[in-house]
Amino acid sequence: MSITKYPMTVQGARALEEEHLFLSKTERPRLSQAIGEARELGDLKENAEYHAAREEQGMVEARIRDIEGRLQNSVVIDVTTIPHTGKVIFGTTVVLANTETDEEVTYQIVGEDEADVKQGKLSSGAPIARAIIGKEEGDTVVVKTPSGTVEYEIVEVKHI
């Protein structure tokens, strides 16, 4: 059985590590204390504070395990250490110009967990990312989106 490794940027790995640290060093002890205090209140069957703390503890522990799994099954790619060739690869930041409207957009190609279109971070599996990965500055690509077909020119590829 082979385990699939998932690409992740340095920033994405750092964010998960920080969340893991917060959950394990701050939230876990806080919830343990809250459960202990709720136990002291007596009958656990009808103790809402106890049940709420236990439920939250379960969610925190599940998230900690999820983060640990994601970090174990990731390949962290530092795009700043890769020679700049003008080619779009995982981790690069790409400036695209809509050939019809000349409107420019900037996206960084990131892992699935890091994607946030509002912050300009596209999952490597997104239609636009799939269309531009492997292409170079000056290339034109046609992207099929839910709202129709859009043609972009790759204006600039940055390793930042």
From Swiss-Prot:
- Record InterPro entries: GreA/GreB_C_sf, TF_GreA/GreB_CS, Tscrpt_elong_fac_GreA, Tscrpt_elong_fac_GreA/B, Tscrpt_elong_fac_GreA/B_C, Tscrpt_elong_fac_GreA/B_fam, Tscrpt_elong_fac_GreA/B_N, Tscrpt_elong_fac_GreA/B_N_sf
Task: Specify whether DNA-binding is a keyword of the entry.
Answer: yes
Q: Which UniProt keywords apply?
A: Coiled coil, DNA-binding, Transcription, Transcription regulation
What start-end ranges are recorded for coiled-coil regions in this protein? Answer: 53-73
User: Which GO molecular-function terms appear in the entry?
Assistant: DNA binding; RNA polymerase binding
Gene Ontology terms: biological process: DNA-templated transcription elongation; regulation of DNA-templated transcription elongation
Give yes or no: UniProt keyword Transcription regulation: yes
Pfam assignment, any one:
GreA_GreB_N
Entry similarity comment: Belongs to the GreA/GreB family.
* Known function: Necessary for efficient RNA polymerase transcription elongation past template-encoded arresting sites. The arresting sites in DNA have the property of trapping a certain fraction of elongating RNA polymerases that pass through, resulting in locked ternary complexes. Cleavage of the nascent transcript by cleavage factors such as GreA or GreB allows the resumption of elongation from the new 3'terminus. GreA releases sequences of 2 to 3 nucleotides.
Q: What is this protein called?
A: Transcription elongation factor GreA
Upper taxonomic classification of the species? Bacteria, Pseudomonadati, Pseudomonadota, Gammaproteobacteria, Pseudomonadales
Instruction: Give the encoding gene's name.
Output: greA
